[in-house]
């Protein structure tokens, strides 16, 4: 079964021109040479102090490089990038024509032939035609994986209708619909945190696990904030890491935690459904962590798969 979600929490930046790829290579944490028509990458833009302004997914759309960022961050990111783009042959702009729709692919049955058209490798990209890209989001849990569809509104809705049909040749007239909370919950359980305007320039890559989850490439050359990010990775051991937690009950949007290792309550960075992401002292699996408002509600800590890579 496949369900679709309008992911209105994202917007797009387009970099066009002969210098687009090389310019971005000198500004962001990912290796832009790894972006191909069949492969996207995750990355971040940092400030001079090594704090994350925005995270993004970068993909090749035609001859351009397109960045998907959190809603409200396209303009701040453009303002930073344009300061350094004066002598480069490229155009940087917010792309209001592109939209993103999420697919929750729940298992695979005998009649799910359409899922064979979707990418299966981490962050892989396939073209579905009509200008629509399908991108593996790198998130999965409990037999469900996340796939992004990029394109203009009517095109991605038509592609979603085809993907959610039990017959790959006949689109559903009524598309099975999930919610943004369903999508975010799977991201949280996979240890994925996205920067919002409220989180922008507040955290280092290490605090968000970007240094171990593939958002930062330590083999590429210099970029803004690189010296600080690299020093923290190679010369220090984080005292805190971002951990997914989940409860047996739905969590309030303002829920806070009590951790036996901390003297103060902890405010999570993201909450959806019964799951949350919170910065905890390392090695929390053996500690008791409860809701601050209801000590009888215990939360289970999960280590993301990238912890063991």
Where are these regions (language model features)?
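Short, surface-exposed ligand-recognition loops at beta-strand->loop->(often short) alpha-helix junctions
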Residues: 14-20, 104-107, 246-252
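Acidic, proline/glycine-enriched N-terminal capping motif
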Residues: 1-55, 59-62
């Amino acid at each position: 079964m496949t369900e679709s979600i309008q992911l209105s929490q994202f917007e797009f930046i387009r970099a066009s021109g002969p210098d687009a790829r090389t310019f971005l290579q000198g500004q962001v944490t990912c290796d832009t040479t790894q972006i191909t028509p069949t492969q996207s990458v995750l990355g971040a833009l940092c400030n001079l102090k090594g704090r994350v302004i925005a995270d993004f997914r970068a993909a090749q759309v035609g001859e351009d490089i397109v960045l998907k960022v959190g809603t409200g961050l396209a303009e701040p990111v453009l303002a930073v990038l344009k300061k350094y783009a004066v002598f480069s042959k490229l155009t940087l702009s917010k792309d209001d024509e592109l939209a993103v729709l999420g697919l929750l692919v729940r298992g695979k049955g005998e009649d799910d032939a359409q899922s064979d058209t979707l990418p299966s490798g981490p962050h892989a990209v396939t073209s579905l035609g009509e200008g629509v890209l399908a991108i593996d989001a790198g998130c999965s849990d409990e037999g469900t994986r996340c796939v992004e569809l990029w394109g203009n509104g009517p095109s991605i809705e038509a592609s979603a209708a085809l993907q959610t049909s039990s017959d790959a040749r006949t689109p559903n007239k009524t598309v099975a619909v999930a919610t943004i909370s369903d999508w975010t919950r799977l991201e949280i359980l996979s240890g994925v945190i996205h920067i919002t305007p409220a989180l922008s320039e507040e955290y280092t890559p290490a605090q968000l696990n970007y240094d171990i989850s593939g958002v930062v490439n330590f083999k590429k050359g210099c970029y803004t904030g690189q010296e600080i990010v690299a020093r923290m990775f190679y010369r220090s051991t984080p005292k805190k890491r971002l951990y997914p937690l989940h409860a047996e009950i739905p969590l309030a949007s303002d829920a806070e935690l009590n951790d036996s290792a901390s003297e103060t309550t902890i405010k999570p960075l993201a909450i959806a459904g019964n799951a949350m992401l919170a910065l905890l002292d390392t090695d929390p699996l053996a500690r008791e962590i409860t809701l601050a408002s209801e000590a009888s509600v215990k939360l289970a800590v999960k280590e993301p798969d990238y912890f063991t890579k």
